């Protein structure tokens, strides 16, 4: 996102304008009897004002229908503010210390933000079920260009985490 490291929003205390792009990769789970495994999408946002949802165009029709039903339940904030929800090419790549994802209007590349001994910085106990196994990264590239906004950041907050829900 556009925030300093670490982002105060992740601690439940947003302090200023936050522009961001978040990759959501659902690896396992079910919703109303349908599998969620393999559903991927990117949400680019201007926090509290708007979102743009980019759905992986590799998803099949069944996955799209399931995601459409899931979106207002599990990702209601993103869905309510969505200016656009569109299927697009989505690329993801990862090495031992970098992570990159891209859709036509938004690109994020991050590198691990090392601790004192060079190992990854992990944070536990954050106030959201979206932040399990939180690992701190730093943006190398964070760009977005659309009719709604144009930004480019580097050296700002980045992270990877796991969302765990049931019910």
Please place each PLM-identified region on the residue numbering.
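Short, exposed beta-strand/loop patches in secreted or surface proteins that constitute
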Residues: 88-94
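N-terminal ordered "arm"
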Residues: 1-29
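Structured domain cores in non-transmembrane regions
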Residues: 26-84
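Short amphipathic beta-strand/extended segments with alternating polar/hydrophobic composition
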Residues: 33-40, 107-117
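Short, hydrophobic/proline-enriched secondary-structure or compact coil segments at domain edges
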Residues: 53, 96-106
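Extended, charged low-complexity segments
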Residues: 115-167
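Generic structural motif
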Residues: 6-8, 27-29, 46, 58, ...
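Broad gene-expression machinery/nucleic-acid interaction feature
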Residues: 19-21, 50, 98
